[in-house]
């Protein structure tokens, strides 16, 4: 898939389309962690929850608007196959764009786990891609409601629980689209760009209390959300959901405070990313800002 250099796809020279030995979730350690994954009923969200179970996370909250029964079964099976005790699974009917729904979820997580270590804001929406004058205002804004407002509401409600936890880590599901201006994608791509700034604000305001937030492009994954994408784009969705899921589990098994507020891509080889840590820190790279 060809992207302009400014999109950063090949900024790390070695890229992946599927999971690889370095990041395999079953080799990672998430013992003792309480994890919340939104949009967990299917797609990347469900696979991410499964990956945390494979890594031994004992407490998993799964949030979605649709049934989570299949996701719960997959999580329990994954933990068993990896040789871990069955995790405590909290299934939450959740609309991330609804303040009361999010507040209710936070209350249930607190009752069940007492705190939260890792929040994965995965729930998302993609509108039908058409030029601005042809957009439906309700559909256009609904994308922002889920992708940005949903991330804001979840972060806002879960921060008190994260501050009680050990890892205090937030992973926001982003997109390479934040760095693109594809005709027709005005709601999705502007919302993802705004999410990057929200990720930075989270760190600016809470890093002193130990909170870490970063955003990640999951790769080009063929999920249910992709149904509204143009056909030429759908044909390029060749990455596995396991690539992103395992990358997230690997990146959060040890606290990577230097990633605070930054944009990452699941396609990037993590060994090369880590090798460029000093370059990233010295240049304050992988953040949204005006370069003059």
Swiss-Prot record:
Pathway(s): Mycotoxin biosynthesis
Disruption phenotype: Leads to complete absence of citrinin production.
Sites where the protein binds NADP(+): 37, 95, 122, 156, 188, 192, 221, 223
InterPro entries named among the record's database cross-references: NAD(P)-bd_dom_sf (IPR036291), SDR_fam (IPR002347)
Entry's Gene Ontology molecular function annotations: oxidoreductase activity, acting on the CH-OH group of donors, NAD or NADP as acceptor
Signal peptide range: none
Cited Gene3D superfamilies: NAD(P)-binding Rossmann-like Domain
Keywords assigned: NADP, Oxidoreductase
EC number of this enzyme: 1.1.1.-
Active site feature: 188, 192
Enzyme class: oxidoreductase
Function: Short chain dehydrogenase; part of the gene cluster that mediates the biosynthesis of the mycotoxin citrinin, a hepato-nephrotoxic compound to humans due to inhibition of respiration complex III. The pathway begins with the synthesis of a keto-aldehyde intermediate by the citrinin PKS (pksCT also named citS) from successive condensations of 4 malonyl-CoA units, presumably with a simple acetyl-CoA starter unit. Release of the keto-aldehyde intermediate is consistent with the presence of the C-terminal reductive release domain.
Family from the record: Belongs to the short-chain dehydrogenases/reductases (SDR) family.
Name this protein carries in UniProt: Short chain dehydrogenase citE
Record organism: Monascus ruber (Mold)
């Amino acid at each position: 898939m060809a992207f302009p250099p400014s999109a950063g796809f090949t900024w790390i020279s070695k890229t992946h389309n599927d999971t690889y030995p370095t990041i395999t979730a079953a080799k990672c350690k998430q013992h003792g962690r309480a994890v919340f994954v939104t949009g967990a009923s299917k797609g990347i969200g469900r696979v991410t929850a499964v990956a945390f179970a494979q890594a031994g996370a004992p407490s998993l909250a799964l949030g979605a608007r649709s049934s989570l029964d299949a996701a719960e079964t997959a999580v329990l099976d994954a933990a068993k196959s990896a040789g871990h005790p069955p995790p405590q699974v909290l299934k939450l009917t959740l609309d991330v764009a609804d303040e009361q729904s999010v507040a209710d979820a936070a209350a249930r997580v607190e009752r069940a786990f007492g705190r939260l270590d890792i929040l994965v804001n995965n729930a998302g929406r993609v509108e039908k891609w058409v030029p601005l004058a042809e957009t439906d205002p309700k559909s256009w804004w609904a994308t922002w409601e889920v992708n940005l407002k949903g991330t804001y509401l979840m972060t806002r409600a879960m921060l008190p629980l994260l501050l009680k936890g050990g890892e205090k880590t937030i992973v926001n599901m982003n997109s390479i689209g934040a760095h693109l201006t594809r005709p027709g994608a005005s709601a999705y791509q502007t919302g993802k760009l705004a999410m990057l700034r929200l990720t930075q604000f989270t760190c600016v305001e809470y890093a002193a209390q130990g909170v870490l937030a970063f955003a990640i492009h999951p790769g080009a994954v063929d999920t249910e959300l992709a149904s509204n994408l143009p056909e030429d784009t759908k044909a390029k969705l060749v990455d596995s959901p396991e690539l992103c899921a395992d990358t997230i589990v690997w990146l959060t098994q040890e606290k990577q405070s230097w990633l605070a507020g930054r944009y990452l891509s699941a396609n990037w080889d993590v060994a090369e990313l880590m090798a460029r840590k000093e370059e990233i820190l010295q240049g304050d790279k992988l953040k949204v800002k005006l370069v003059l």
